[in-house]
């Protein structure tokens, strides 16, 4: 795989002439040995590490050469020739460059350099290759083979990770970086794409024999709601791995202890920690589980302001349930095996006995001793059995020497317990509280890691020496530090060597009047004195935004970039290569006067903030003004404001641009530093607790007040363009002056991956403080200069940052657990206990590539504020989208709760309406004064349900109660109900105006809903005589429709379960009169379905229609079909709420059901057998039912046609519809109970059968 290259001028050759004849000064001894006569080219290609996938192409050839060396010395010449041939084949134009490769698993951390041939596109092949000595390839092959093997192993480790940065688990959790790994799985920091909070993903391979996440999930779920247990978010599994997602925590107690000056906690901190751990142990015991791996690294503090003083229990992989299903203690096993960590394990665990509740308390006791004393007597012992013997023989009362005497009672209590005994938690908790009360310890007192060691700061200020030998390694003067905002980008840990273990590198507070150098990119950097000695870190003051190669022995170069775009490309491409012996700090002028960036071997920067939790002021700064990210500290702010203005002036910037390079040796740098110190006054920082600040308090601009209209043609020389400027600013300091995203026209560029100098992987602070790039715009679009404030849900506040601490003890059965805890910034060790020659050996993490910059953009997309308005009119920042200006927000589709036309005009109503209509409550009356859209209606045929959408209550009404109905023409009513033979009669051909025809066509085209006031018709008067009957008998019947498949041969009339819906009706007058041809007619009426008349005809009206006595079967069919047509016509009139259609029925036209033609020459329907449920049935079809016990006189009749005697004609069928007084059918006299019918039968019966039967009666009597 080709190695990634970046075309930038070489820093080492910045001042060299263009002819390339002068030789470059080597950056290290190894480099000088490898290429003593290396010529300088005008444009050298900087080599960076590749993505962790495959070794470089030439490594294979180098390995082949090495093998040939071992096989035959005579093959060396041929191997060199083959190697050159391979190089020429792969790279037509090559340059030879040496690069530093990480030495994986090298305990001393030595980093070697190896020479590779890399392509060059701007130089001829013969020129570039002719400058290189031929024998250097063999030198590279000899010296680089061992390094490449280790690089290969590093690549292998990374490629075998279960997850990679950028992966999304379950379409919800995006992997940010790996923060731990071991024999039981891997731990990643991730981001919840829904809530935007940082989470921890614990992953184990599905193929490993020992599955522990199942127990982890079980215990974690049981413990939810407990005070000292982190929140469980989710879990799952696939064919590759199992995973559990939980709340991300901060530093563990092992790291916090080692960060202290003497490696121990004060008694005040120890007592309060012991009390919290005791309560956590009691909580897990209360749910029936033992932890069995109590140790400092399995307890961490929270990382948010509200929980940063709370201790959380982690890692339940070794937990065991000690109770049975009934709550009794399980019987102990004879040989249970060792579980836990050797240093903190109880004597029972060393004896392989079954562990009980008291064994967790033994581990707590050992933790308390280590907290106060700094170590345990058996710390140096490596053998587990030897540690167990030591614990048995050791007088534990000696361990209480520096502990309160009251804790002797704690020791005596746990010594008296056995496996099945329950500890007296209340007594032990009271013991700790009594000790705290006697010593005046308050819960609000600051913990040791929250304090500032003023003595250490004074020593730093007095000496100005960046390295002071102190016991703990990589601590910073016992100073609480602010978390780096952008330090979560990559996962490579800093590798310490043995020479650094006993030396603490404490960064000094710079003199206030040190003059910064301003390079051509307007990045102010200050000079400092480099450290002496090969093993000590050297403070380099280069350009923080340029990730340059810096030589190891005192050479300090300023990067000379031709334009700003090259600088940005340099940042984005790859990390720089640095010597292993160097720890390079770059002064951060913009953030605070005590902030340094550590340039790590992979080019990442560590923010070392001396004054932790400093409150940064927010100041609005106009464009072309000075930087705004300043510490609000007395004496510092005014000085730096003037300094920044001075050094960011165009004159100085132009001078810097004219320079081709700056080379400073040790002596010059030291003299300059001493000169500045004579004139300097040292500022001491006051550490304050960072207030939990809400993003709602921030200005809408989010600190980015620069309005950039032309990105490409205008560059602001006054704005701070350093990427390193805001990385240490917490949520309390969200004002940045860094506008590089807009100034350089690369709005989508994320910040540089940064890490603390303690080599800890710290997650970003919640606001990422509006992120470095202004607006987080995507695609290079011009933002409006303001960043959407992050919601409080996504506000992650990281308050503390501490020195690098390793968990030197590995739990049993956990080969490499790295502490096994979901600690955010922890490193986990791989050795069993302490190493042979040092007590602080560490686990070397695999080299991980910096994640893609495009993926980083999506990490910290700001969420919109949770405004009170549910539908803001302005644009809402979506994931990866630019905030739309108000003009563009109008084109965005609006969000509706319910699809109601015009609801957007009712702001208050829109908030209260539900998301959907689901099972509304049926009532009798609605609130008065409701108007649309507060009231909606759903129409089902002639029944309308009016609904109060705010309260989800509806009432059932008929069409006539809510609509304005016109007086129907008698001719239209008649024509809609007469068969076609009658329509042809000239006496029935009444005049029908074109207006009525147009209205009828319009009505037929309307949907099946009730519409108000479509025509300007007069409201019909309701029949007051029938109103009482309607109100008395109109009721809602609930039920359900059941459809069953039944065999065809079960149509026996005596069947008690199934009834023939079209069965014969006996004893009716029609059947008695015409037995020869009445079957076809009466088949349309079933006596089972007869009901009290819904529509009853009076005697005088029925007698007005004369029918020939000698009618045939066809006429009987016609009469039966006429009933169906009549029902259809009535249905039309009801469902639309106006007059019935007045159109003449033509051939081929359909009625309201779309089935029956008006020319009634069609066969009768086949009988359908539908089961009848002896229960209530629904009236969804819209028919109005009454009980069978009611008299026929109280039957409900239609109200739309009032009685007008003066308009009666000879051919008027439906002139008046009074209450029916007499019956003409035996079936109608004894109707069945409507409640016995299914909804389908109810609909068929009420709308078809009854009108059909009535009309047949009409024909019979006539």
Swiss-Prot record:
GO molecular function, a single term: ATP binding
A Pfam family annotated for this UniProt entry: Pkinase
Subcellular location: Cytoplasm, Cytoskeleton, Spindle; Cytoplasm
The Protein kinase domain, residue ranges: 173-436
Entry keyword DNA-binding: no
InterPro entries: CK1_Ser-Thr_kinase, Kinase-like_dom_sf, Prot_kinase_dom, Protein_kinase_ATP_BS, TTBK_Asator-like_STKc
PROSITE patterns: PROTEIN_KINASE_ATP, PROTEIN_KINASE_DOM
Residues engaged in binding ATP: 179-187, 202
Sequence ranges of Basic and acidic residues compositional bias: 667-679
Protein keywords: ATP-binding, Cytoplasm, Cytoskeleton, Kinase, Nucleotide-binding, Serine/threonine-protein kinase, Transferase
UniProt main location, coarse: cytoplasm
Active site: 293
Disordered, as annotated region: 13-35, 662-724, 755-792, 984-1003
Subunit structure: Interacts with Mgtor.
Protein's name in the database: Tau-tubulin kinase homolog Asator
Species for this entry: Drosophila melanogaster (Fruit fly)
Top-level taxonomy: Eukaryota, Metazoa, Ecdysozoa, Arthropoda, Hexapoda
Gene this protein is translated from: Asator
């Amino acid at each position: 795989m080709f190695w990634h290259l970046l075309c930038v001028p070489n820093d080492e050759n910045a001042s060299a002439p263009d002819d390339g004849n002068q030789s470059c000064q080597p950056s290290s001894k190894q480099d000088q040995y490898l290429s003593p006569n290396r010529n300088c080219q005008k444009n050298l290609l900087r080599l960076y590490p590749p993505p962790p996938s495959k070794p470089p192409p030439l490594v294979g050839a180098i390995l082949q050469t090495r093998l040939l060396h071992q096989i035959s010395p005579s093959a060396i010449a041929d191997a060199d020739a083959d190697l050159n041939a391979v190089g020429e084949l792969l790279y037509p134009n090559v340059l030879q460059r040496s690069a530093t490769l990480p030495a994986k698993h090298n305990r001393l951390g030595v980093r070697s350099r190896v020479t590779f041939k890399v392509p060059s596109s701007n130089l001829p092949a013969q020129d570039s290759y002719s400058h290189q000595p031929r024998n250097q390839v063999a030198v590279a092959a000899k010296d680089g083979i061992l390094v490449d093997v280790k690089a290969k192993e590093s690549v292998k480790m990374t490629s075998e990770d279960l997850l990679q940065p950028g992966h999304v688990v379950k379409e919800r959790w995006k992997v940010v970086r790996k923060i731990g790994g071991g024999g039981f799985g891997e731990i990643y920091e991730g981001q919840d794409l829904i809530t935007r909070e940082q989470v921890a993903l614990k992953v184990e391979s599905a193929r490993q024999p020992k599955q522990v996440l199942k127990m982890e999930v079980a215990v974690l779920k049981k413990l939810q709601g407990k005070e000292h247990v982190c929140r469980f978010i989710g879990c799952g599994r696939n064919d590759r791995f199992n995973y559990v997602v939980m709340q991300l925590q901060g530093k563990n107690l092992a790291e916090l202890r080692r960060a202290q000056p003497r490696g121990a906690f004060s008694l005040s901190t120890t007592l309060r920690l012991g009390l919290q751990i005791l309560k956590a142990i009691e909580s897990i015991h209360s749910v029936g589980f033992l932890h069995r791996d109590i140790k400092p690294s399995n307890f961490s503090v929270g990382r948010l302001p509200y929980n940063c003083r709370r201790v959380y229990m982690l890692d339940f992989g070794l937990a065991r349930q000690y109770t049975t299903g009934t709550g009794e203690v399980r019987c102990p096993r004879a040989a249970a095996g060792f579980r836990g960590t050797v240093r903190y394990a109880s004597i029972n665990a060393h004896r392989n006995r079954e562990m009980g509740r008291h064994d967790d308390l033994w581990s707590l006791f050992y933790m308390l001793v280590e907290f106060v004393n700094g170590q345990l007597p058996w710390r140096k012992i490596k053998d587990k059995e030897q540690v167990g013997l030591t614990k048995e023989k050791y007088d534990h009362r000696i361990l209480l020497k520096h502990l309160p005497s009251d804790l002797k009672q704690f020791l005596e209590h746990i010594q008296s317990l056995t496996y099945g005994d329950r500890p007296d938690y209340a007594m032990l908790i009271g013991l700790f509280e009594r000790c705290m009360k006697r010593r005046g310890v308050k819960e609000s007192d600051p913990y040791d890691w929250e304090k500032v060691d003023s003595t250490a700061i004074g020593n730093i200020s007095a000496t100005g020496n960046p390295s002071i030998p102190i016991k703990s390694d990589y601590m910073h003067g016992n100073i609480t530090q602010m978390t780096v905002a952008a330090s979560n980008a990559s996962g490579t840990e800093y590798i310490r060597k043995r020479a650094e273990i006993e030396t603490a590198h404490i960064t000094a507070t710079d003199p206030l009047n040190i003059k910064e150098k301003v390079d051509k990119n307007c990045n102010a950097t200050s000079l400092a004195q480099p450290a002496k000695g090969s093993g000590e870190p050297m403070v380099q003051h280069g350009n923080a935004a340029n990730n340059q190669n810096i030589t190891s022995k005192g050479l300090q170069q300023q990067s000379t970039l031709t334009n700003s775009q090259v600088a940005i490309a340099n940042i984005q491409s790859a990390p720089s290569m640095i010597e292993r012996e160097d720890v390079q700090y770059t002064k951060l002028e913009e953030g605070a006067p005590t902030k340094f960036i550590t340039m790590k071997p992979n080019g990442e920067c560590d923010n070392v903030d001396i004054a932790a939790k400093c409150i940064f002021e927010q100041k609005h700064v106009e464009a072309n003004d000075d930087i705004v990210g300043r510490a609000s500290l007395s004496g510092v702010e005014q000085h730096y404001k003037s300094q920044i203005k001075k050094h960011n002036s165009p004159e100085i910037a132009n001078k810097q641009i004219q320079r081709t390079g700056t080379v400073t040796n040790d002596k010059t740098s030291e003299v300059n530093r001493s000169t500045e110190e004579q004139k300097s006054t040292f500022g001491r920082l006051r550490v304050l607790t960072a207030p939990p600040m809400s993003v709602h308090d921030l200005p809408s601009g989010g600190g980015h007040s620069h309005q950039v209209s032309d990105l490409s043609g205008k560059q602001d020389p006054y704005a701070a363009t350093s990427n390193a400027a805001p990385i240490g600013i917490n949520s309390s300091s969200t004002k940045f002056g860094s506008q590089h995203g807009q100034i350089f026209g690369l709005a989508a560029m994320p910040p540089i991956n940064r890490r603390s100098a303690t080599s800890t992987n710290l997650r970003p602070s919640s606001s990422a403080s509006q992120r470095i790039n202004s607006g987080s715009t995507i695609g290079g679009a011009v933002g409006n200069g303001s960043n959407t404030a992050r919601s409080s849900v996504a506000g992650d506040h990281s308050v503390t940052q501490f020195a690098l601490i390793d968990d030197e003890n590995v739990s049993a059965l956990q080969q490499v657990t790295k502490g096994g805890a979901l600690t955010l910034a922890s490193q986990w060790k791989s050795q069993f206990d302490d190493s042979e020659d040092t007590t602080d050996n560490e686990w070397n993490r695999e080299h991980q590539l910096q994640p893609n910059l495009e993926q980083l953009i999506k990490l910290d997309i700001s969420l919109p504020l949770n405004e009170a308005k549910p539908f803001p009119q302005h644009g809402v920042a979506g994931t990866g989208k630019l905030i739309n200006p108000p003009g563009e927000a109008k084109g965005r589709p609006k969000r509706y709760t319910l699809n109601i036309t015009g609801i957007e005009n009712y702001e208050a109503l829109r908030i209260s309406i539900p998301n959907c209509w689901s099972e509304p409550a049926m009532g009798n009356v609605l609130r008065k004064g409701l108007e649309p859209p507060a009231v909606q209606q759903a129409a089902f045929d002639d029944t309308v349900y009016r609904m109060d959408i705010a309260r989800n209550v509806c009432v059932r009404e008929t069409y006539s109660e809510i609509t304005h109905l016109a007086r129907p023409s008698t001719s239209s009513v008649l024509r809609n109900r007469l068969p076609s033979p009658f329509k042809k009669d000239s006496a029935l051909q009444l005049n029908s105006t074109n207006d009525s025809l147009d209205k009828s066509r319009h009505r037929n085209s309307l949907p099946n809903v009730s519409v108000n006031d479509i025509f300007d018709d007069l409201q019909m008067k309701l029949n007051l005589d029938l109103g009482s009957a309607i109100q008395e008998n109109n009721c809602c019947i609930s039920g359900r429709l059941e459809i069953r498949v039944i065999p065809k041969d079960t149509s026996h009339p005596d069947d008690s379960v199934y009834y023939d819906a079209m069965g014969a009706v006996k004893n009716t007058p029609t059947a008695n009169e015409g037995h020869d041809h009445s079957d076809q007619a009466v088949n349309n009426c079933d006596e089972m379905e007869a009901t009290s008349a819904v529509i009853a005809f009076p005697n005088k009206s029925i007698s007005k229609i004369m029918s020939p006595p000698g009618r045939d079967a066809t006429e009987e069919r016609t009469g039966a079909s006429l009933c169906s047509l009549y029902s259809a016509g009535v249905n039309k009139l009801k469902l639309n709420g106006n007059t019935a259609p007045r159109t003449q029925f033509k051939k081929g036209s359909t009625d309201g059901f779309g089935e029956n033609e008006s020319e009634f020459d069609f066969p009768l329907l086949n009988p359908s057998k539908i089961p009848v449920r002896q229960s209530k049935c629904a009236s969804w079809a819209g028919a109005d039912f009454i009980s069978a016990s009611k008299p026929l006189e109280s039957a409900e009749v239609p109200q739309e046609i009032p009685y007008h005697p003066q308009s009666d004609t000879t051919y008027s069928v439906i002139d008046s519809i009074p209450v029916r007084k007499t019956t003409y059918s035996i079936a109608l006299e004894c109707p069945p109970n409507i409640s016995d019918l299914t909804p389908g039968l109810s609909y068929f019966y009420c709308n078809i059968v009854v009108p059909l039967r009535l009309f047949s009666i009409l024909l019979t009597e006539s």
